[in-house]
Design a protein with these regions (language model features):
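Long, domain-scale functional regions
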Residues: 1-242
Length: 242
């Protein structure tokens, strides 16, 4: 085997300029840092989460032309597998319409549905994986039109999310998260109390008899998925700035 000898005289030298692009900070890092100076629009809650507050803070963000608002940076969000990281929580700026949280036949809770988010009709409308549902199934997630539940006793209406559904850019950013669905003991209390009870062990099955209490659905206090609703504590903390 012949090996070519390295000849040092074959080397050439030249001048060049190297440019390094500074990597921008993560949104969560940017907001957390901004909160140290912008105390009019941002505040850290009792549990270390950084939140936008006040009547109309500049917390808008756009994805593919859709406008959302940043609720804040939530600490140590579990992705459902035990991995935890800080996450930015956003809410759509405009309503997508009026649809049932859940509904049912009149024989079940007098047609009012069941207050269990993990099985709710609205959850199945918003999230992926429910395409087999004949009404509402993943229409919002898939940017499709069809029929959605709109009132009690399984009433339906036509719905169209071809322009308002989740766009691909945002889909690629949405990860699973553990949502806390613990029930509150009252409708009126401070935000920190709501926050604690959302993460508590009390579920939404608070009745034992009557026409509005006939379902046999097991209640849970957590749910893992991509799209949920604003917590009562989110609203309470957001309005704390006026």
């Amino acid at each position: 085997v012949n090996y070519q000898k390295y000849n040092a005289t074959n080397n050439t030298r030249t001048k060049c300029d190297l440019y390094f692009k500074v990597k921008p900070p993560m949104v969560s890092e940017y907001i957390t840092t901004l909160a140290q100076t912008d105390t009019a629009n941002l505040a850290v809650d009792d549990y270390g989460n950084t939140r936008y507050i006040g009547k109309n803070p500049n917390n808008f963000v756009s994805f593919d032309g859709d406008i959302w608002r940043i609720i804040g940076v939530m600490k140590n969000v579990d992705d459902g597998t035990g991995n935890k990281e800080d996450r930015v929580k956003i809410i759509r700026s405009e309503s997508i319409g009026y649809y049932s949280w859940d509904t049912s036949e009149s024989s079940v809770n007098n047609g009012r549905g069941v207050n269990e988010w993990s099985q709710a009709d609205l959850m199945k409308l918003l999230n992926p994986g429910y395409e087999s549902e004949s009404v509402g199934g993943s229409l919002y997630w898939n940017n499709k039109s069809g029929t959605c539940y709109s009132d009690y006793k399984n009433q339906t209406t036509s719905c169209n999310f071809t322009s308002t559904g989740i766009k691909d850019k945002l889909k690629n950013m949405l990860g699973n998260a553990v949502w806390n669905t613990g029930a509150s003991t009252t409708y009126s209390q401070i935000a920190s109390k709501f926050y604690t009870e959302e993460r508590g062990t009390r579920n939404g099955k608070i009745c034992t008899s009557g026409t509005y209490c006939t379902d046999a659905v097991a209640r849970t206090t957590t749910w893992t998925g991509k799209i949920g609703l604003m917590y009562p504590s989110d609203y309470g903390y957001a309005t704390s700035g006026g």
